[in-house]
């Protein structure tokens, strides 16, 4: 079955990952608005794989199209190595977390580009304070109709992915009480959150065209749902996750997303169905995932009862179990065991803060974990070559 075989020439469910890193001053541990000083040099190395974001203390990278999670792992290691080494050559560091533990959005410079000036003009304070860092996973689709059908079903699993990825418990020096405060901040933007269901791709296009005609948006990329059909790449893009701190965590998430989509498609091919739940119900789980992460309970809508996030994660693994070997992603998905044992990034950050009482120690931990598994000799080689 070509749709479950990454080695098949027509395998559709390819992987692409975007990550947004923090640029850190290692002396103060504050964010550093420095992208303009390293962008030209970085793009000589990475070309279009490195981009600025609205705030100059953010650097965005994107992998090439990958067929397997192990290809994606090599790409993420290469990109983190390149950006990390480039930052180090300027006396800086990078870190991966959904928010910075204490830096203020009010002290960040905006990247000088009309696109970002336009966003700020429209969104005002909601845009200026959008100092958050995400991970987006793109999965290739066989066709547009299949993309919509998979999105309708996969919406149910978005809170599961958020709970696993939580890495933003702090905001401007305060414990927020949330495991993903990033997801709370992003709700200030329009056209965010769990997407609605669509009966067809034509209905989705009609929605986009209404927004364009009424000047609500000027392009389809300004629909920022937690999952969306990408307007240019032909992918289904999952946007709900905080950026993963460790490489292993990023690959775990990417492997899960790919496996979920392939399993849903497999059910379609066998004329089987999976119930499509309302946005109102899924939003209940999203809020719980943001608030409690893997330490709380989510709702099993089929049973109509609460289950621990750990138990629902076991159900998710059982759901994708018959496709992960074909996809070569069992080891990546099994990393969930390590997250359950040692905690999510958010849980580890909070534990470090509780043990040390020093929020700068949290930044140091994030810097270390971001580059964990990235060989320094490889990082240097990428930058110099």
From Swiss-Prot:
InterPro entries: GCL_type2/YbdK_subfam (IPR050141), GCS2 (IPR006336), Gln_synth/guanido_kin_cat_dom (IPR014746), YbdK (IPR011793). Belongs to the glutamate--cysteine ligase type 2 family. YbdK subfamily. It catalyses: L-cysteine + L-glutamate + ATP = gamma-L-glutamyl-L-cysteine + ADP + phosphate + H(+). GO terms for biological process: modified amino acid biosynthetic process. This is Putative glutamate--cysteine ligase 2. ATP-dependent carboxylate-amine ligase which exhibits weak glutamate--cysteine ligase activity. Its EC number is 6.3.2.2. It comes from Herpetosiphon aurantiacus (strain ATCC 23779 / DSM 785 / 114-95). GO terms for molecular function: ATP binding; glutamate-cysteine ligase activity. Keywords: ATP-binding, Ligase, Nucleotide-binding. It holds the Pfam family GCS2. Gene3D superfamilies: 3.30.590.20.
């Amino acid at each position: 079955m070509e749709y479950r075989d990454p080695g098949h020439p027509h395998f559709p469910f390819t992987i692409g990952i975007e990550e947004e890193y923090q640029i850190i001053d290692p002396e103060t541990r504050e964010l550093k608005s420095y992208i303009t000083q390293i962008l030209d040099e970085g793009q000589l190395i990475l070309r279009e794989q490195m981009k600025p974001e609205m705030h100059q203390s953010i650097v965005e990278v994107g992998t090439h199209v990958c067929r397997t999670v192990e290809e994606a792992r090599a790409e993420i290691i290469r990109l983190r190595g390149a950006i990390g080494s480039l930052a180090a050559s300027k006396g800086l560091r990078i870190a991966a977390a959904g928010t910075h533990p204490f830096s203020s959005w009010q002290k960040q410079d905006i990247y000088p580009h009309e696109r970002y000036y336009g966003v700020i003009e429209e969104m005002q304070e909601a845009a200026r304070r959008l100092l958050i860092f995400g991970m987006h996973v793109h999965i290739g689709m066989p066709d547009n109709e299949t993309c919509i059908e998979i999105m309708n079903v996969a919406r149910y699993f978005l809170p599961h992915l958020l709970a696993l990825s939580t890495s933003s418990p702090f905001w401007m020096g305060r414990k927020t009480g949330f495991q993903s405060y990033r997801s709370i901040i992003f709700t200030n933007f329009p056209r965010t959150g769990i997407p609605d269901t669509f009966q067809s791709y034509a209905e989705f296009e009609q929605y986009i065209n209404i927004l364009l005609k009424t000047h609500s948006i000027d392009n389809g990329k300004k629909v920022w749902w937690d999952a969306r059909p990408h307007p240019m790449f032909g992918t289904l893009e999952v946007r709900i996750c905080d950026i993963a701190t460790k490489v292993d965590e990023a690959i775990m998430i990417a492997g899960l997303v790919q496996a979920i989509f392939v399993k849903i498609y497999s059910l379609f091919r066998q004329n089987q169905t999976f119930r499509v739940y309302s946005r109102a119900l899924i939003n209940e789980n999203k809020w719980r995932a943001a608030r409690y992460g893997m330490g709380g309970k989510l709702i099993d809508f089929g049973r109509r009862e609460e289950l621990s996030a750990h138990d629902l994660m076991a159900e998710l693994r059982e759901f994708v179990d018959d496709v992960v070997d074909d996809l070569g992603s069992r080891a990546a998905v099994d990393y969930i065991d390590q997250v359950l044992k040692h905690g999510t990034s958010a849980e580890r950050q909070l534990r470090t803060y509780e043990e040390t009482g020093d929020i700068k120690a949290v930044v140091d931990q994030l810097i270390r974990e971001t580059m964990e598994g990235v060989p320094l000799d490889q990082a240097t080689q990428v930058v110099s070559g």
